[in-house]
């Protein structure tokens, strides 16, 4: 088992032994450092808190500066917790974590925040077909249609699919394959797409089933 934080660099393609183009996402998975070790005695559960990147102290709040100083590391851009059961190695406070714990062919789950699309209508947000394009229709082309009865039930049911803000959701994509590891640059090349925009941060965890 292994877990790490990474920064999404972008997408590319590689060619396999069958000369097929495979779309891949490149993730910069270091430098990561252990910013806190949580124990069952002190915190009620066991986990490692990882920090990624190096940030100017002036950009970090005073409480977080003290938090990083306790670990003896420079402030990072993002922190995330991973249960100790997700790590094969025993990590110490302030130690570094790299892509060496992964191997090519591993299946991983990747969690990130999807791209924000802003306020979107039902056709874009929920794939509605829209209204009729003929028979005198003038302004119902991308409208949602009826959202409830009149006297019965006299209300709109909870969960009705409507227009609203689209994207910017926490999403986990399961079962992606690591096709290449470049340890000298701490890069993971993962088959397929992962959530988020370029330069956003993602959590990568090996599959446990």
From Swiss-Prot:
One of its GO terms (cellular component) is cytosolic large ribosomal subunit. Keywords: Ribonucleoprotein, Ribosomal protein, RNA-binding, rRNA-binding. Residues 128-156 are annotated as: Disordered. GO terms for biological process: translation. GO terms for molecular function: rRNA binding; structural constituent of ribosome. NCBIfam families: L3_bact. Belongs to the universal ribosomal protein uL3 family. One of the primary rRNA binding proteins, it binds directly near the 3'-end of the 23S rRNA, where it nucleates assembly of the 50S subunit. Part of the 50S ribosomal subunit. Forms a cluster with proteins L14 and L19. This is Large ribosomal subunit protein uL3. The gene is rplC.
């Amino acid at each position: 088992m292994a877990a790490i934080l990474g920064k999404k660099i972008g997408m590319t393609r590689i060619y396999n032994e069958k000369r097929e183009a495979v779309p891949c996402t490149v993730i910069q998975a270091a430098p990561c450092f252990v910013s806190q070790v949580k124990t069952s005695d002190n915190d009620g559960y066991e986990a490692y808190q990882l920090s990624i990147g190096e940030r100017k102290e002036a950009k970090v709040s005073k409480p977080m500066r003290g938090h990083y100083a306790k670990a003896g590391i420079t402030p990072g851009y993002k922190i995330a917790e991973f249960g100790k059961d997700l790590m094969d190695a025993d990590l110490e406070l302030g130690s570094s974590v790299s892509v060496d714990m992964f191997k090519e062919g591993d299946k991983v789950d990747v969690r990130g925040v999807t791209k924000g699309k802003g306020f979107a209508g039902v056709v874009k947000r929920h794939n509605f077909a829209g209204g009729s394009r003929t028979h005198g229709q003038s302004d119902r082309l991308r409208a949602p249609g009826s959202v409830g009865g009149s006297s019965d039930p006299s209300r709109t049911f909870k969960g009705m699919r409507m227009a609203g803000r689209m994207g910017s959701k926490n999403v986990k994509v399961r079962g992606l394959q690591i096709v290449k590891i470049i340890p000298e640059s701490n890069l993971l090349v993962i088959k397929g797409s992962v959530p988020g925009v370029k330069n956003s941060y993602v959590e990568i965890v090996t599959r446990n089933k």
